[in-house]
Amino acid sequence: MSSIRAPGVYFEKVEDRLPPLGLGPTGQAGFLGLATRGPLHEPVRISSTQDFLDTYGAPLHEGFLAEAVKGFFDNGGKVCYVVRIAHTSARSPEGCAASSSATLQDRLGQPTILVQARSEGTWGNEIRVDVRTPPPAVQALLVRDISPGENFAQIRSGRGFQVGSQCRIYDGAQERYVTVNRVEGKALFWQDPIDVGFKSSAPTFIEPLSFEIEAQVPGYKERFTDLSLSPASGRYFARFINAESQLLRCVDQISPSPFPQSLPQEASRLMLEGGADGLADLTPHDFIGYNKGPGDRRGLGALEVVEDIDLIATPDLFAARELSRGRGFRSDKDVEIVHEAMITHCERLKDRFALLDLPPKAGFDRALQYRLLFDSAFAAFYYPWVVVPKEGRKRRTIPPCGHIAGVVARCDADLGVHNPPANAIVEGIVDMEMLLNDDHLGQLNHQGINCLKYAPARGIRVWGARTISSDPDWRYVNVRRIFNTMRRALEQGTQWVVFEPNGPTLWKQIHRTLHTFLEQLWLKGYFQGATASDGFYVVCDKTTNPPENIDAGILVCEIGIAPVRPAEFITFRISQHMEDRASEDSMQR
């Protein structure tokens, strides 16, 4: 209170605090590639090389994804998202990735459980399954007689019983089976009354019946005990195994046999079979994919829903060309189709940047020829391929995109998005596929190919930061990524504007918020100019919001920035629809 007043209820107007704007995380890559195992067409957050190996298994001999992800983390990357690619087709299962499986029979020979490998691939053909029905872990003594028509029992101890326990009641002369639906201390209840009576003096025992499944591959074993066929049980096999297993997923076939004949038969050394990698028939469409909504996304379409991604890379495109043996990928033209789709993906979402690889063993002329097929500010080529160490003294040549993504992430963290990711050392490589002389470096850089250069005593470094755009205003990677990062920040940070009264008060609030945000970026070196007004401007008033816009429910704020390179102003124009939202880039020379 500003002054002492008489006791009572008072109302004070407090100015709302608007959410501050800020740049979100950058340098988070989305990788599409081939792997031994792991979920297909599903983006998985990966935070280390070991995390990748735990999820996707040992590196695939024919692919480059594992080495690319390792290169990302070796060079300073912190988080990436991986989408495993394989051939999948709704039209025909032939040539498609498939999970290994085996069907368990019940005691009457009816199918009761479908056991599958956790993910598609031939890796699942090495899974061995054992099924056992062990003796009951607990046995409770009946302490009160059960009369015919009753549905409960009093026992000496309720330990080991739970909702969903499938139990045997027996006295040596007869037996019945019930599924517990309630446990109250030492009392067990079930749904259907039993048709016979049991005497506590017989004696009568009640015991839960269960089974166990053990799965193993060379070097790893897992065992699941006390499993139940009842969906009401906390140990219901399908739910429990699917949540806990690294190897299996199970499907309840719902046996028609009565319990306990519906329990699976014991099995020893049962090998899963039928797994397929789906690599020989890979097509460009497997990488491009689609986004038809939750549960129906493939390839690039699966990455659309991951908002944090701002870099994308596909290290296995040329591996797919070799694996398909001329069926799905017939030539570099098919690789070109995927590269074009990656560029379109980034241009459409407007907050991502594609890191592209040139063909392996491409000489100067071939590299230049392939690069000139594209024109976009949302992508960059890096060249040549790099040599990485393998176990022992072996080496392997791989595309550079994963290592470059890590360099970009490191530069973002250390210097900021506005600094070009160039003249930065590339960690984790021991050589390059070919060494380029200064003449080649100059010509390739001029044409928008970012080369790797060996500098004596300074290691192998990224020696360029150009996009593949023919527009000089978008020549540099950092300029495009400044806009990408700002766009994302502005779109996310101005959500509060929608449905607010469109008038001078709102315009002033927006102007203040945006000016503060841009001033902070200018102080960090994102924009040129000795003063803030030299580096950016913000206009949000009646000149950008005439009556016809207000009547149409549209709010327009105009932002101009002078990025550190090039030196011209480039206008960033944001149109806010009060019922919805839209944004656009425009240029001002």
Predicted regions and their residues:
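Structured, hydrophobic secondary-structure cores that serve as assembly/anchoring elements
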Residues: 1-107, 113-118, 170-173, 216-219, ...
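A short, compositionally biased
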Residues: 109-111, 159-163, 204-212, 555
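Short, cationic low-complexity segments
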Residues: 137-139, 234-240, 578-589
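Small/polar beta-strand repeat architecture
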Residues: 171-244
